[in-house]
């Protein structure tokens, strides 16, 4: 079961990458061969040199966006499949040869989380296609009132799954490859990511002092915010902030003075990079991580100095902190995060402070909608990767305003609103177990300084995730998992190479519990996908146009007036009635009837109003009342057969399944019953 579940995660991640690639290859045809090639080449090299291959892939972790821009000329989120495919290919050969390698207390939660991701994202992606794969080719539809066609919605869900799933797979791969071998881990993994960070930060510093539009001609360049080589200032700032103290941690694990000098220079560069990004989460990350660095120096390096000297140093530190605070509050600043921080920070009054904390909780309305959705879908959530798809509709329903595009959300609440209580059991148990480990384990003296510094970065990322989503970027997510493993090594190392026996396998009862929870989560997600979270049902709830499956009118169809159209074998329309009743009339073409009796089904608002076998061309009419409180009506039609008149020598290439006519009336005729 251990090998099978890991293989399932790998296959699921490969499928998610494939979906993204196929969809986005329409705008960049070379993306498909590049992604396939990246996976195949990385997997082939990894068969013989897996650690070297992984290091090479990690070297491009923070550089790939700029490289794509340089080669292709523009960057879309999903073009990152090239790097994701290479990363998966580099890990796959060793991963499939080993069982899950997580420490015992973490294995069950992480495997449960991984299986929940692997099994639920396809259901959610199919939901956005209304379980009709043909919608992958439809671009006139929207997934919310603000737009977004079904292919992009499904791709976004796949991208979120890849970010989460590859992170877990990477964490496991590290336990397989470097069990307690911190030095080799540092030489292979940390060195590769540091090299990538150095290039990205150098680009960010150049953007700050030289040309802000260098590799930065998009939104953030126009805002005067550096993005390094990541094209997005927010994750770049977090990466810049995270690695500064980490360089000190790595250098002080060696005896090289050169590396230590370079690490100090890197710490300065990291602050320049995060400052250039003007990212508030990056500034908070840098402050928290640097505070842990100061504490590490104080608690491990200054133990032997006199009490008087320590008192002086404390005084100097307090004065310095006060000066920095006053500078942040009062000194003029036109660059960096300070202007944005000042716009966010509260005034020195109780109402202002209360409003500040309320805004941090609501986060431009995203938190408010998340809280509402948790109440509405508590057990199974809105679906993995779906919060950003449904938030515009529900924000409009709650406030009657359009929510501005943003990524402002509490990460933990974000996972809860997407996965629900059942789907969140895995990640919740893992977060709790790892947090307990980080906060309670005392590292040995030989690595205590570096462990405290790495702990500081982990704590910083955990805290900023209360008000943001930095790890939604796959490079930041991989970095977080890397730091988590690094801290485990530093906290557990004894100064000698130790190879523990293979982690204990999960028992039958544990596996039964895991699969029961996964099955319940998938079932609940599928039920919601056919019920209140079905895309056309969301269109009914939020009153936006939605239709597909009509032969002669797409991509335009007037859903708010009397119309007659030919539906294919399956069609969906969200009507906008102008009266209390909807008159629906359906009929078949003579050519279709000539083939034999045809089964016909029609649903209105999920209620079956017609299910019959038709053998004539006579129309069938039903009168259906609009539900109280609704301004829209969802109509689904299905027929067992269709024809193309062109196949019979006629000049008509349309697929004709069911002729559908709708009209809006105040009431059915006298003597005619309604539904």
Stretch-by-stretch model annotation:
Residues 319-320, 443-449, 483-531:
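A juxtamembrane structural motif centered on a specific transmembrane helix
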Residues 67, 140-151, 217-229, 361-365, ...:
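Juxtamembrane membrane-water interface segments that cap and precede transmembrane helices
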Residues 232, 348-352, 357, 362-405, ...:
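TM-adjacent membrane-interface loops and short helices in multi-pass inner/ER membrane proteins
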Residues 527-675:
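C-terminal luminal/periplasmic domains and tails of membrane-associated envelope-modifying transferases
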Residues 2-20, 24-28, 37-45, 85-87, ...:
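Alpha-helical transmembrane segments of multi-pass inner-membrane proteins
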Residues 72, 126, 202-211, 272-277, ...:
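A membrane-periplasm/extracellular boundary helix in multi-pass inner-membrane enzymes
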Residues 131-142, 210-222, 341-344, 394-395, ...:
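Peri-membrane helix termini and adjoining interfacial loops of integral membrane proteins
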């Amino acid at each position: 079961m251990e090998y099978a579940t890991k293989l399932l995660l790998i296959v699921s991640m490969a499928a998610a990458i494939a979906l993204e690639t196929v969809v986005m290859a329409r705008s960049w045809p070379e993306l498909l061969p590049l992604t396939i090639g990246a996976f195949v080449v990385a997997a082939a090299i990894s068969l013989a040199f897996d650690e070297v291959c992984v290091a090479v892939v990690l070297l491009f972790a923070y550089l790939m966006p700029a490289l794509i821009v340089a080669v292709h000329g523009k960057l879309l989120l999903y073009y990152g499949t090239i790097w994701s495919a290479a990363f998966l290919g580099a890990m796959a050969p060793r991963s499939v040869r080993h069982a899950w390698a997580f420490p015992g207390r973490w294995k069950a939660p992480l495997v449960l989380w991984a299986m929940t991701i692997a099994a639920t994202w396809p259901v959610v992606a199919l939901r956005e296609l209304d379980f009709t794969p043909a919608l992958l080719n439809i671009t006139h539809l929207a997934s919310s009132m603000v737009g977004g066609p079904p292919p992009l919605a499904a791709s976004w869900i796949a991208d979120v799954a890849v970010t989460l799933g590859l992170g877990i797979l990477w964490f496991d791969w590290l336990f397989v490859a470097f069990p307690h071998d911190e030095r080799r881990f540092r030489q292979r993994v940390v060195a590769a990511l540091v090299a990538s960070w150095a290039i990205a930060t150098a680009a960010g510093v150049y953007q700050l002092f030289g040309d802000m539009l260098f590799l930065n001609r998009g939104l953030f360049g126009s805002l005067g915010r550096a993005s390094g080589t990541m094209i997005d200032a927010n994750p770049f700032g977090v990466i810049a902030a995270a690695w500064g103290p980490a360089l000190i941690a790595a250098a002080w694990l060696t005896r090289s003075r050169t590396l230590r000098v370079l690490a100090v220079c890197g710490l300065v560069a990291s602050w320049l990079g995060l400052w250039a990004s003007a990212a508030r989460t990056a500034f908070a990350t840098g402050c928290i991580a640097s505070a842990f660095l100061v504490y590490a120096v104080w608690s491990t390096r200054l133990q032997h100095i006199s009490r008087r000297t320590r008192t002086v140093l404390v005084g100097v530190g307090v004065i310095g902190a006060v000066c920095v605070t006053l500078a942040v509050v009062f000194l003029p600043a036109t660059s960096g995060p300070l202007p944005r921080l000042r716009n966010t920070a509260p005034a020195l009054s109780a109402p202002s402070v209360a409003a500040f904390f309320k805004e941090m909780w609501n986060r431009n309305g995203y938190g408010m909608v998340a809280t509402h959705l948790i109440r509405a879908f508590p057990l199974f959530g809105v679906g993995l990767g779906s919060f950003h798809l449904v938030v515009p509709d529900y924000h409009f329903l709650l406030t009657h305003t359009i929510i501005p595009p943003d990524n402002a959300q509490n990460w933990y609440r974000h996972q809860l609103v997407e996965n629900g209580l059942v789907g969140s059991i895995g990640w919740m148990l893992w977060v709790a177990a790892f947090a307990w480990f980080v906060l309670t384990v005392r590292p040995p003296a030989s690595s205590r300084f570096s462990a405290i510094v790495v702990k500081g970065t982990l704590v910083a990322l955990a805290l900023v995730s209360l008000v943001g989503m930095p790890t939604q970027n796959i490079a930041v997510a991989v970095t977080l998992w890397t730091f988590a493993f690094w801290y485990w090594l530093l906290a557990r190392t004894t100064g000698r190479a130790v190879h523990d026996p293979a982690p204990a396998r999960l028992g039958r009862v544990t596996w039964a519990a895991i699969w029961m929870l996964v099955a319940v989560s998938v079932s609940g997600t599928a039920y919601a996908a056919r019920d209140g979270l079905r895309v056309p049902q969301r269109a009914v709830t939020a009153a936006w146009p939605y239709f597909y499956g009509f032969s002669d009118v797409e991509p335009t169809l007037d859903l708010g007036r009397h119309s007659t159209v030919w539906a294919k074998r399956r069609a969906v329309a969200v009507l906008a009635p102008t009266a209390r009743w909807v008159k629906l009339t359906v009929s078949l073409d003579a050519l279709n009837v000539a083939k034999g009796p045809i089964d016909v089904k029609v649903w209105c608002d999920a209620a079956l109003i017609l299910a019959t076998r038709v053998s004539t061309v006579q129309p069938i009419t039903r009168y259906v009342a609009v539900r109280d409180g609704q301004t829209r009506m969802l109509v689904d039609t299905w027929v067992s057969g269709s024809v193309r008149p062109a196949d019979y020598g006629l000049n008509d290439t349309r697929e004709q399944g069911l002729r559908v006519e709708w009209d809006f009336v105040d009431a059915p005729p006298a003597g005619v019953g309604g539904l």
